[in-house]
Regions:
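Conserved short alpha-helical segments that host acidic/polar catalytic motifs at enzyme active sites
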Residues: 3-6, 10-176
C-alpha cells in the first residue's frame, strides 16, 4: 500500500547521515512480480524516479542506501540485486571476504553477473542453492554457511509473497 512505499523511502532518508553513493528498493507485487528501482546518487534521485513511491505497486519491499566497497558507484552496482531468474531480490550491508572465490565457482556453473559487487554474488549463490533444494530458508542457510565476512541481508522472493528474510552477522539491520 501507499504507506509501505513511503516508509521504504523515509527509512532510507533516515540512513542518509551515514553517507552513500546510490539507493534502491525492490517491491513484490501480485500483478507485476518483483519490481526493482535503483539509482546512483542521492536518495532524492530515486524518490523522483518513482514519484515518491506513487509509481510502485506492492505490499512487501526492501530498500538500501549503498556506500561502495566493491564496484564503482553506478546504477548497476546499486542495491537491490536480483537473481538471474528475477525471483529473488537482496540488499546487503557488509563485506563478503570470499566473494571472488564464490563468483569463480558460479561462473563455472554458467551463472552470469551484471555488477561488480559482492552482493550480487550472494544473490546468485542464493538462487543456485534455491534451485537445488526448492526451500528458501534452507537455501539461505547454505549461503550463510558458505560466505565469510560481515553481513546484514534483506531478501524477498517472488515465490514467497508474504515473507521477508533477514540475517545479520556483525552489521546493522533495520526491519520496519
Amino acid at each position: 500500500d501507499r504507506r509501505q512505499r513511503q516508509m521504504c523511502i523515509r527509512d532510507r532518508a533516515r540512513m542518509e547521515y551515514r553517507g552513500y553513493d546510490s539507493a534502491g528498493v525492490a517491491v513484490r507485487s501480485e500483478t507485476k512480480g518483483l519490481q526493482v528501482y535503483k539509482s546512483k546518487g542521492r536518495l532524492q534521485v530515486l524518490s523522483d524516479m518513482i514519484h515518491g513511491g506513487a509509481d510502485v505497486e506492492g505490499t512487501l519491499g526492501i530498500g538500501h542506501t549503498r556506500w561502495a566497497t566493491h564496484g564503482e558507484p553506478n546504477d548497476i552496482n546499486a542495491h537491490p540485486h536480483v537473481s538471474e531468474d528475477g525471483r529473488i531480490a537482496m540488499v546487503h550491508n557488509g563485506i563478503i571476504e570470499n566473494y571472488m572465490e564464490i563468483k569463480q565457482q558460479l561462473l563455472r556453473h554458467g551463472v552470469t553477473f551484471k555488477s561488480e559487487t559482492d552482493t550480487e554474488v550472494a544473490a546468485q549463490l542464493l538462487e543456485f542453492h534455491y534451485n537445488e533444494c526448492h526451500n528458501m530458508l534452507e537455501a539461505v542457510g547454505r549461503v550463510l554457511r558458505r560466505i565469510e565476512g560481515s553481513y546484514a541481508f534483506g531478501i524477498i522472493c517472488a515465490d514467497y509473497p508474504n515473507a521477508l528474510i533477514a540475517a545479520r552477522k556483525d552489521s546493522p539491520l533495520i526491519i520496519g
